[in-house]
């Protein structure tokens, strides 16, 4: 009996009415090239319609557990951030519930982990992330960067997938530097202060912003990418130096928690919106970041832990680099404490650790490969004389 000519099992057509047939492992089941192409288009449409936020929303405990792997200390801040981020994305998963957006304000000295917290959150949730410096922004019409360029960075990090960018996180640092010069509205234009707050206010509270795809200043003949910011989580950070005096005047205390002594660590400073308004933030701007999270100054012990404990700790990174050369690198506690002490003296917190350690390690990393040593012990004197660590390693190995 003659077998019928093969046809596409989806559209029923046979060549040459349709393209080539692809045979299935199942008997007499085929699909034509045209149907394959249509199926790909349908899948692409479904992909575009799918939610662009986190693929799975972790619980607050899971979020904090992940932060613990990268950020030392700051327990209260990590708990507050975990809950805030969880609620933000839960709100997006349930759009029928009328829950307002709650942006976050991080207050803490330089180098306490504000940027790291925001970055780690975005990476864990697998959402686009962008960092901006508030001091580079100006209101329209002045020399500087338009606030829409903040969203351009987010778009770039989302590979210009607008829907995905609209579920992202933006961290704006140095937000305290755009405070107006006094609590009363200025009679003159304040290019770096109130005007920038007003410009940022629009995108933070939720609007459709026109983003220039090439960056730079907007001009009339340029094409724009519309980005809806209502679901973008904005995390604002700043040191707010001098805010302690405003709080002190309000609560009538002599010490209140910005300077890092033992008592201050036990009694965290509580900043209220009125304090921020007195500092120079406009009321509308403060109202758009209702969650105020405070970070403690870091102690010497905190900095030693930062060097060794996080998943990507500096010490672990250097040890791995030396291990690739067949060398075991060990740091003494005295050396680590001295690195922490020097960073503390610089007043740059955790940011100073890498600069101090890198300066000491660069000569060692230059000379150690091919030296034949199997173990290097890096002690306190080696911070200023790093090659002595290599000499001592050779002597130990020879004896």
UniProtKB/Swiss-Prot annotation:
InterPro entries: AAA+_ATPase, ATP-dep_Clp_protease_ClpX, ATPase_AAA_core, Clp_ATPase_C, Clp_protease_ATP-bd_su_ClpX, ClpX_bact, P-loop_NTPase, Znf_CppX_C4
PANTHER family in the cross-refs: ATP-DEPENDENT CLP PROTEASE ATP-BINDING SUBUNIT CLPX-LIKE, MITOCHONDRIAL, ATP-DEPENDENT CLP PROTEASE ATP-BINDING SUBUNIT CLPX-LIKE, MITOCHONDRIAL-RELATED
Pfam families, alphabetized: AAA_2, ClpB_D2-small, zf-C4_ClpX
Quaternary structure note: Component of the ClpX-ClpP complex. Forms a hexameric ring that, in the presence of ATP, binds to fourteen ClpP subunits assembled into a disk-like structure with a central cavity, resembling the structure of eukaryotic proteasomes.
PROSITE patterns linked to this entry: CLPX_ZB (PS51902)
Residues annotated as binding ATP: 109-116
Alphabetically ordered keywords of this record: ATP-binding, Chaperone, Metal-binding, Nucleotide-binding, Zinc
CDD domains, alphabetized: RecA-like_ClpX
GO cellular component: HslUV protease complex
Single GO term (MF): ATP-dependent protein folding chaperone
Gene Ontology BP term (one): cell division
HAMAP family per the UniProt record, alphabetical: ClpX
Domain ClpX-type ZB, first and last residues per copy: 1-51
The protein's name: ATP-dependent Clp protease ATP-binding subunit ClpX
Residues binding Zn(2+): 8, 11, 32, 35
Organism: Thermus thermophilus (strain ATCC 27634 / DSM 579 / HB8)
Role of this protein: ATP-dependent specificity component of the Clp protease. It directs the protease to specific substrates. Can perform chaperone functions in the absence of ClpP.
Family from the record: Belongs to the ClpX chaperone family.
